[in-house]
UniProtKB/Swiss-Prot annotation:
This is Adipose-secreted signaling protein. GO terms for biological process: adaptive thermogenesis; glucose homeostasis; positive regulation of non-canonical NF-kappaB signal transduction; positive regulation of protein kinase A signaling; positive regulation of transforming growth factor beta receptor signaling pathway. One of its GO terms (cellular component) is extracellular space. One of its GO terms (molecular function) is protein phosphatase 1 binding. PANTHER family: ADIPOSE-SECRETED SIGNALING PROTEIN (PTHR13287:SF2).
Length: 174
């Protein structure tokens, strides 16, 4: 069937280009909306007590310091701490009350490739049972795909040592 349709296709014999390219009138330039915020960490409220923090692309086996702002949450007071069930790959460094809400600083370890979600719970010091769930979502690239452009609020603080079994000094048993 592909051979039957082959003769019916129209062919372009020539291509004509515009003689002048003005910056204002050119249709080939890409223009972005001024209101786009693609280079910052995005915080979205999923429910009354849950927030999703999207930190963009990260590189595997690297540690990152992530700073973001949570909006004012009525369930939290000024004395905020992490609940005693910590994550292995996400560690809370500080929570500071600011006029816009809370400035949260944490350290994230990109331990495997893919879209990863790590969770931490923030609670009040006063002993109330209210807590806020913060889910940090990252897209972790493997080491062969280059270095990602980090969003504002994300800073690389170190790389984990990579274990490669081919370069082992161990000679085995005698």
């Amino acid at each position: 069937m592909a051979a039957a349709n082959k003769g019916n296709k129209s062919r372009v014999r020539s291509i004509r280009f515009a003689t002048s390219h003005d910056a204002e009138s050119s249709q080939s330039h890409v223009h972005f909306d001024e209101k786009l915020h693609d280079s910052v960490v995005m915080v979205t409220q999923e429910s009354d007590s849950s927030f999703l923090v999207k930190v963009g692309f990260l590189k595997i086996l690297h540690r990152y310091e992530i700073t973001f702002t949570l909006p004012p949450v009525h369930r939290l007071s000024k004395d905020v701490r992490e609940t005693p069930v910590p994550s292995l790959h996400l560690k809370l460094l500080s929570v500071m009350p600011i006029p816009e809400g809370y400035s949260v600083k944490c350290e994230y370890s990109a331990h495997k490739e893919g879209v990863l979600k790590e969770e931490m719970l923030l609670a009040c010091e006063g002993g109330s049972d209210t807590c806020v769930r913060v889910i940090v979502q990252a897209r972790v690239m493997d080491r062969h795909h280059g270095t990602p452009m980090l969003l504002d609020g994300v800073r690389c603080v170190g790389a984990e040592l990579e274990y490669d079994s081919e370069h082992s000094d161990w000679r085995g048993f005698d």
